[in-house]
Amino acid sequence: MVKLRLKRCGRKQRAIYRIVAIDVRSQREGRDLRKVGFYDPIKNQTYSNVPAILYFLEKGAQPTGTVHDISKKAEVFKELRINQTKSNK
């Protein structure tokens, strides 16, 4: 199973997180399948590769709580619903 979760980067006392698609059994710092964005909690900046996130969500990837909140602010789930309604028609 694949999850979308945060992977810690940066230096001591200055954490930056990458949003990655990673196998559930991997460690937090383990090998990721693909980098799909980043999150800087100090500057409160985010970048999301929305098409990549949508691809993994459509394939059944589960976002963690924090990644879910970040994606919700970026309105990824609205685009997911739009894509699903288009494919149903």
From Swiss-Prot:
Keywords: Chloroplast, Plastid, Ribonucleoprotein, Ribosomal protein. GO terms for cellular component: chloroplast; mitochondrion; small ribosomal subunit. SUPFAM superfamilies: Ribosomal protein S16. Belongs to the bacterial ribosomal protein bS16 family. GO terms for biological process: mitochondrial translation. It comes from Drimys granadensis. HAMAP family: Ribosomal_bS16. This is Small ribosomal subunit protein bS16c. It comes from the Eukaryota. PANTHER family: 30S RIBOSOMAL PROTEIN S16, SMALL RIBOSOMAL SUBUNIT PROTEIN BS16M. InterPro entries: Ribosomal_bS16, Ribosomal_bS16_CS, Ribosomal_bS16_dom_sf. It is found in: Plastid, Chloroplast. GO terms for molecular function: structural constituent of ribosome. Coiled coil: none annotated.
